[in-house]
Amino acid sequence: MADVKKVVLAYSGGLDTSVILKWLQDTYNCEVVTFTADLGQGEEVEPARAKAQALGVKEIFIDDLREEFVRDFVFPMFRANTVYEGEYLLGTSIARPLIAKRLIEIANATGADAISHGATGKGNDQVRFELGAYALKPGVKVIAPWREWDLLSREKLMDYAEKHGIPIERHGKKKSPYSMDANLLHISYEGGVLEDTWTEHEEDMWRWTKSPEAAPDVPTYVELTYRGGDIVAIDGVERTPAQVLGELNRMGGENGIGRLDIVENRYVGMKSRGCYETPGGTIMLKARRAIESITLDREVAHLKDELMPRYASLIYNGYWWSPERLMLQQMIDASQTSVNGVVRLKLYKGNVIVVGRKSDDSLFDASIATFEEDGGAYNQADAAGFIKLNALRMRIAASKGRNTLK
C-alpha cells in the first residue's frame, strides 16, 4: 500500500463513506481528501465538512454542482430524448460522469495519486465512476473498498464505526428500508420489499410526488420556451437550467407526475428492480418530443430515434466520456439548431398532456396539411407515381412468385 500517498474520496458524510474514510487512512496509511457534491439531492452537505474534520481530514471540497449538472449533463442527454429500456430516464447514471470528472480535477489540483468511491461491487456505479476516471486520467489508481474489505453488512459497518470512534447518528429517526439515491433529476429506491417483484411499493415510500389519486382535481397549464433544444423559460420567465428542472420537479410532483416502477438490466449482468421519481424529467421528455415534432426534418427525427437506444446504453453503462458518446453528442447537438419555440402542456393527475406547440422554425405547413381546399399547394394526383415507384420492388417480387398469399 506504500504506493498510495493521497486519495480523493467521494464523500457523502453518511455511514458508508465515513467508514471508508477511516478505513483508507488505516489500510493505506495515506492522506484522504474529501469531495462532497451538491447535485440537488435535497440534503444538507455542510455537515459532511464537520464529520471529515473530526476524522482528521485537512483538505475538504464541498461543491455546488447543480447548474453544471443540469447544463452540461442533463440537458445534453435530454436533447436525444434519452430513455433506457423504454422507461428509465437515467437519473443516477447521468450524475456519475460529473462526479468522476470532479474527482479527477481535485486529484490533479491536490497532487493525489488515487481516488476512491463507495459503490458496491454488485452495481453499475462502480463501472461508471471508474470508466470515467480512467478516461480522464489513465494512470489514476482507483480504490473500491467494497471490493476489498470484509465489512459486508450494515451491522459490520456500525461495529467498525463504534470501534474507531466514527461519529454516527443515533437520534431514533426511523431509517428508510430502501437504498436511495437523489439528485436534481430524480430520486431512486431499491432494496427492501422491492426485491420481491410481485410486491407493490408502499405509498409512503415516495418523497417528491403526490399519488395521482391525491393530486389536484384542477389541471395545471404551463408553457415551456425552447432555444437550441433546451428549455430557457417557464411561462415566459427566463430561468437557469437548474431553476428550470427544480420548478418542473415542483409542478410535476404536485400533479402526481413522474413515478416509475421497473426491472432493469444492469451492465454487470443482473436484473434489478427500482422505483424512481422523475417529475421534471418526465415533463421535459414529453415537451421535447412535441417541439421536435414541428421543427425537425422527418429523417433527422427518425435517425435520432434509431440511435437513441445506443446513446442511452452508453450513458447507463458508464461511457459518457467515451469517443463514441462524444461523436453521437455532436450529431445530436447539430440537430437542435432549429429546435426553438414554445410548448404548452396540461399537467393532470399523473399525466403530461401536450395541448399546443408553436415555433418560428416550424416545418408544419397548414396550407399543405389541411383537409380543406388547399389552393393547389398539394397535387394529390402526384401520389399515384410516388406509390407505384415505392411498390416497384414488391411488384417485381410478386411477379416472381414471392408474394405471401397462399
From Swiss-Prot:
Principal location: cytoplasm
Pfam families xref list: Arginosuc_syn_C, Arginosuc_synth
Family listed: Belongs to the argininosuccinate synthase family. Type 1 subfamily.
UniProt keyword Transport, yes or no: no
Record's subcellular location: Cytoplasm
InterPro entries: Arginosuc_syn_C, Arginosuc_syn_N, Arginosuc_synth, Arginosuc_synth_CS, Arginosuc_synth_type_1_subfam, AS_cat/multimer_dom_body, Rossmann-like_a/b/a_fold
Catalysed reactions, semicolon-separated: L-citrulline + L-aspartate + ATP = 2-(N(omega)-L-arginino)succinate + AMP + diphosphate + H(+)
Keyword Cytoplasm: yes
Keyword terms, alphabetized: Amino-acid biosynthesis, Arginine biosynthesis, ATP-binding, Cytoplasm, Ligase, Nucleotide-binding
Subunit structure: Homotetramer.
Enzyme kind, highest EC tier: ligase
UniProt name for this protein: Argininosuccinate synthase
Molecular functions (GO terms): argininosuccinate synthase activity; ATP binding
Enzyme nomenclature, EC number: 6.3.4.5
One GO biological process term: urea cycle
Residues that, per the record, bind ATP: A10, Y11, S12, G13, G14, L15, D16, T17, S18, A37, G118
Chain coiled-coil ranges: none
Pathway of action: Amino-acid biosynthesis; L-arginine biosynthesis; L-arginine from L-ornithine and carbamoyl phosphate: step 2/3
Binding site for L-aspartate: T120, N124, D125
Source taxon at top rank: Bacteria
PROSITE patterns: ARGININOSUCCIN_SYN_1, ARGININOSUCCIN_SYN_2
Binding site for L-citrulline: Y88, S93, N124, R128, S179, S188, E264, Y276
